[in-house]
Swiss-Prot record:
Record family assignment: Belongs to the polypeptide deformylase family.
Binding-site residues, Fe cation: C91, H133, H137
EC number: 3.5.1.88
One Pfam family linked to the record: Pep_deformylase
Cofactor(s) of this protein: Fe(2+)
Species for this entry: Klebsiella pneumoniae (strain 342)
Gene3D superfamilies for this protein: Peptide deformylase
Cofactor note: Binds 1 Fe(2+) ion.
Keywords linked to the UniProt accession: Hydrolase, Iron, Metal-binding, Protein biosynthesis
Transit peptide keyword on record: no
GO molecular function, one term: peptide deformylase activity
Name recorded for this polypeptide: Peptide deformylase
CDD domains in UniProt: Pep_deformylase
GO terms for biological process, alphabetical: co-translational protein modification; translation
Length: 169
């Protein structure tokens, strides 16, 4: 198990479209485990492989209070979405920044689990929002892409300043 480095904007690798996982094997399972370690270490609720410079369609999520409800989505597909909602979202790749993002209230997805078994899931609330957020990462999209150009620029400047301060520390 390992904690991986999370990419931050403006790193262009965050914009790369992830490739489907061809086979769920021990290497993919190790990536999943490392992604959970990374997500928990960074105090996140979701992480897409793209964020750790692995360009495969893998997502890990745990929105539970006790951090014991791991959800693995390999090659996720959005089947249905319904309603409208939105919360102030944050992102491990855009540290300490939040913004209101419009999302579907409910989603239905199909994916493979950690063992490569197919399943379908209907989700609402925070889980539905998190799934949509992480699936965006797999196609190179970030939550700031939903914002005005001015807000995007302000957030980028704040993150770049934060990264400069951290690199000096």
């Amino acid at each position: 198990m390992a904690v991986l480095q999370v990419l931050h904007i403006p790193d262009e690798r965050l914009r790369k479209v992830a490739e489907p996982v061809k086979e769920v094997n021990a290497e993919i399972q190790r990536i999943v485990d490392d992604m959970f370690d990374t997500m928990y270490a960074e105090e996140g609720i979701g992480l897409a492989a793209t964020q750790v410079d692995i360009h495969q369609r893998i997502i890990v999520i745990d929105v539970s209070e006790n951090r014991e409800e791991r959800l693995v989505l390999i090659n996720p597909e959005l089947l249905e979405k319904d309603g409208e909602t939105g919360i102030e979202e944050g992102c491990l790749s855009i540290p300490e920044q939040r913004a209101l993002v419009p999302r579907a209230e409910k989603v239905k997805i199909r994916a493979l689990d950690r063992d490569g078994k197919p399943f379908e899931l209907e989700a609402d609330g925070l889980l539905a929002i998190c799934i949509q957020h992480e699936m965006d990462h797999l196609v190179g999209k970030l939550f700031i892409d939903y914002l005005s150009p001015l807000k995007q620029q302000r957030i980028r400047q704040k993150v770049e300043k934060l990264d400069r301060l951290r690199s000096r520390a």
